[in-house]
Every structure is written in structure tokens, then in C-alpha cells.
Design a protein with these regions (language model features):
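Glycine-rich active-site/cofactor-binding loop and its immediate structural neighborhood
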Residues: 94-131
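Oxyanion/phosphate-interacting regions
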Residues: 7-26, 191-200, 207, 213-275
Length: 275
């Protein structure tokens, strides 16, 4: 799909790069699904230093994305790639931040709630993001100042269907105040934050979701706030942050109320709130 077919006036500057990372995300998603749909295949599950799981699907997806971005003028920071020292990274004006398989635990649980995340970050700010949900054949993308969109993907051809602008108009009609939280990492601090919200929103409804789907729910307008008082890394949020920003939302440090920044010396995110 040529992204400019949606509205060429919106993508004059970044159109080729946006199309490149969308196609990379779709191909990476296909590589993941080729493994996911064959449970008899050896998924080669390993444990990383932080005890989080790593699978064959993570590695295959990373290889697809790294190859797609090889000719890009920007360096790549991927969860599954080499993490260069900050003394080198601090000179990067722009870079790609990638999670080839966000939600590996969800992948292993076979609950379909895993994603491919690709973001372009400039001067610490995510300016473009793509999230593909391969098991649901749903694509999200956004660019700073140009809007955010979602579309279905044909499972056979990977053709992208009609784009819908985010937030979805119908998503905010006649529904309770909705909080989305992690399916696998709901911390006591996050629960305290949610309980405080209940005092002001008696109709509060809690929705659990895996991976960067939580940020997508905010961008769609299907949820109002996403608190995360638990460890995350920059590649977990960069793409969703870009999409949420493009849809008119904020991703803020829970303590300082300032926007999250990227390509920091410490790649861990602080606790944050998306609203």
C-alpha cells in the first residue's frame, strides 16, 4: 500500500520512511505468525539477564526489521539488537527505537496480545510510530502533527484496508470512564493510582491488555487513562507514544508531569501516565 493514497498532503516529508516501517512491521508480523501458528515448532525460549523471555519469534522479527532499516540514514536501537554505549548514542539526532515482539509473555500464553513496535525518535521525542498486532491483523500508525490512524490488514496479502482516523468517533460514546492497565504487570502502586481515580469516577471500568495495545486503546479513544507504575523500557513505549501524541494524548512522567523522553543514558522509563 502506498501511504500517500490516504492523503498525500499529510505525508510529504516522511511518506517514504513511514511506508518503509509499515511494510517492515507487516513482514515482521508475518515472520512472528509463521512461528505462532505452528506450536509444534521449537520456539527456542530462552531467558535474558532480567529473566524476561526471548523466543525464536523475537529474533526473526528483529532480523526482518533490521534488514528493512539497513539503508536508512538513522541508527537502530532494538530490544534484541546491540545496545551501544551512551557515549556513542548521545550524538544521535534521530534514531529508530524498535521492539520486534512486544509482549513475549502474551505470545507464550497464546492470547494474541503481542505487537511489533517501530518508532522514529528525534531529539528525544517520538515523531513517528507504527504498531502492528499480527494475531489480530490490526495496524496503527501516527506522525507528529499529522494525525494517527488504524486499519485492518488482509491476513493473506497483507494489503492494508481503509484507514480510520484516531480517535475513533464512536469509541467515546455512552461508555464508562475506562482505565487500561497491564495484563501481566499490575503493580500495587498502579492499583493505588486506580483506586484514587475511583473516588472521582464511580463508573470506572478497568480493562486489562498486553503489550503496547494499552497505548493503542488510549489513541483509539476506547480508554481514558493508562497508568504504569512498573518497569518498562524505551522500546516498550516509543511507537505507542508517537501514536498517542498524534491522536492528541500525552505520555507523562508520573512524578514530574513532564513528557517521557528517549535515547536516555538509562533506557528504563520512569513510571508514567498516558491520558
Amino acid at each position: 500500500m502506498d501511504i500517500c493514497s490516504i492523503d498525500c498532503s499529510l505525508y510529504v516529508i516522511f511518506a517514504p520512511m513511514l511506508d518503509t516501517i509499515i511494510q517492515a512491521a507487516l513482514r515482521a508480523g508475518k515472520a512472528i505468525m509463521d512461528i505462532y501458528t505452528h506450536p509444534d515448532l521449537d520456539w527456542q525460549v530462552e531467558r535474558k539477564a532480567d529473566n524476561s523471555p526471548l523466543t525464536l519469534a523475537d529474533r526473526k522479527s528483529h532480523a526482518v526489521i533490521a534488514e528493512a532499516l539497513e539503508s536508512s540514514p538513522y541508527p537502530l536501537l532494538s530490544e534484541e539488537g546491540a545496545h551501544l554505549p551512551y557515549d556513542e548514542r548521545k550524538h544521535w539526532h534521530s534514531l529508530w527505537i524498535v521492539d520486534p515482539l512486544d509482549g513475549t509473555k502474551e505470545f507464550l500464553k497464546k492470547n494474541d496480545e503481542f505487537t511489533v513496535n517501530i518508532a522514529l525518535v528525534t531529539d528525544g521525542v517520538p515523531v513517528m510510530g507504527v504498531i502492528y498486532v499480527p494475531a489480530k491483523y490490526r495496524l496503527f500508525w501516527g506522525e507528529k502533527g499529522q494525525g494517527a490512524f488504524t486499519a485492518e490488514v488482509d491476513p493473506e496479502t497483507l494489503h492494508i484496508g481503509q484507514a480510520e482516523s484516531l480517535p475513533l468517533k464512536e469509541a467515546q460514546l455512552n461508555r464508562p470512564y475506562r482505565v487500561v492497565a497491564s495484563r501481566s504487570h499490575l503493580s500495587p502502586e498502579t492499583e493505588t493510582f486506580i483506586n484514587d481515580l475511583r473516588r472521582h469516577h464511580t463508573d470506572l471500568e478497568l480493562v486489562s491488555a498486553g503489550s503496547s495495545l494499552k497505548l493503542c486503546l488510549i489513541a483509539e479513544g476506547k480508554a481514558d487513562v493508562y497508568p504504569r507504575m512498573a518497569p518498562t523500557m524505551e522500546w516498550d513505549t516509543a511507537a505507542g507514544h508517537a501514536i498517542a501524541l498524534a491522536a492528541g494524548h500525552e505520555v507523562l512522567n508520573a512524578e514530574t508531569d513532564l513528557p517521557l523522553t528517549y535515547n536516555k543514558e538509562d533506557l528504563h522509563n520512569p513510571w508514567f501516565v498516558v491520558k
